[in-house]
């Protein structure tokens, strides 16, 4: 009775996120508005928003398989240890199963959503390496057609932003909380006239954000050959 309260020291560490400032500005002359059938302002604003989205994608992809910084001062570098060597093949079902197994062996909670970022070529590879008689064929075909976006427990995200080293494309399989995006300043948009530019309309977007890999056990690099 009345024993001491047990003290449990849960191991933890901090990760450093270096914020990067992004700006986008473009001018639309009044003459352009006259020459075009529609007001181009909304198209320019949409292009700026897409540019900011691509910048966020690049930060996340770079952080996923790059060097993470941890420790009290954020100066200790940590490399990603989970890497599936590509051999001489593109993306195969065997590689997807290995990525899933890697996360499972690392005791990643299966209730946490899992994603995999691949390129268009990897979807084609999956379809080409799956036999028509295989039970996986119809699922992969539906994936290639965009009818579904999930296979083997992964939500598929198709991107052209993945790095290519020679003929090797680095795809990324990860649990959702394995990568964090830090936003210092959310996306701000302004559309104003510039008196100093002949009263041209300026579309301006800015933001400040960065990303880091939170846990190595929750991120797997899947290397795929592209010929």
Task: Give a label for each model feature.
Residues 26-27, 78, 182:
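Generic signal for short, ordered secondary-structure residues
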Residues 70-142:
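Extended, solvent-exposed, turn-rich assembly/linker loops in the middle of proteins
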Residues 11-72, 104-120, 156, 189-213:
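Long, contiguous amphipathic alpha-helices that act as assembly "spine/axial" helices in icosahedral shell
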Residues 60-64, 99, 123-126, 222:
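Generic structural signal of hydrophobic/aromatic residues within well-ordered alpha-helices
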Residues 3-6, 10-18, 35, 84-91, ...:
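Sequence/fold signature of self-assembling virion shell proteins
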């Amino acid at each position: 009775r009345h024993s001491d309260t047990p003290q449990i020291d849960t191991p933890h560490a901090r990760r450093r996120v270096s914020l990067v400032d992004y700006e986008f500005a473009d001018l639309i002359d009044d003459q352009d508005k006259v020459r075009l059938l529609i007001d181009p302002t909304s198209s320019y604003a949409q292009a700026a928003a897409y540019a900011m989205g691509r910048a966020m994608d690049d930060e996340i992809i770079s952080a996923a398989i790059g060097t993470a910084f941890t420790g009290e001062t954020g100066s200790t570098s940590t490399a990603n240890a989970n890497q599936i060597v590509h051999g001489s093949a593109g993306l195969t079902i065997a590689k997807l199963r290995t990525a899933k197994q890697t996360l499972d062996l690392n005791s990643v909670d299966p209730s946490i959503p899992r994603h995999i970022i691949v390129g268009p070529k990897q979807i084609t590879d999956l379809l080409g390496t799956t036999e028509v008689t295989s039970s996986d064929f119809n699922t992969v075909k539906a994936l290639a057609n965009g009818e579904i976006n999930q296979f083997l427990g992964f939500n598929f995200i198709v991107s052209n932003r993945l790095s290519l080293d020679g003929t090797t494309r680095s795809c990324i399989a990860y649990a959702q909380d394995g990568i964090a995006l830090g936003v210092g300043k959310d996306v701000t948009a302004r559309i104003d006239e510039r008196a100093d530019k002949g009263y041209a309309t300026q579309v301006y977007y800015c933001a400040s954000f960065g990303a880091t890999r939170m846990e190595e056990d929750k991120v797997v690099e899947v290397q795929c050959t592209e010929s």
